[in-house]
């Protein structure tokens, strides 16, 4: 039977969330702090569960990256992955590499933007294969980021929908999933084997 392994990214394969780290890397510390200060009213509402998480995330993303040239954004994503490999959990990377080496189909399923997730896995130790990255995608128009997302935030039930899209015929493979948060619950429940906070 086919073996499919799916990994959450932030907090599962990394030590922390990467959104804030990426904003700081791409925009600088002071611009980040100013942006968060301007965004604080609806961030507070989000923390009080009075404003949807995905809308808050998109507004924050639009503030920092709306209007950026796509090439500039992709270059910042690649540079971020190169300079922040310390964020990765080595035990998680080893498990991912083992799955690839043994011939499993592997995907990273993340609410983070796939542009900065994918470069972390350009080279996985011990294998020439790469995992598929199923992340939140950004919308572009005429070579620039609009600040909006082209797909729903890849969180909760959306993770399962994206897995089904890439790996249909659910009865024909064994699914192993790794996650660490509420946003991974549906994915872990959908799997034959689900591991919660496995690399800590």
Question: Predicted segment positions?
Answer:
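Helix-loop "lid/cap" segments that line or gate small-molecule binding pockets
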Residues: 44-49, 56-65
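C-terminal cap/substrate-recognition subdomain and adjoining C-terminal extension
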Residues: 1-4, 75-76, 82-200
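Low-complexity, intrinsically disordered basic tails/loops
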Residues: 58, 71-74
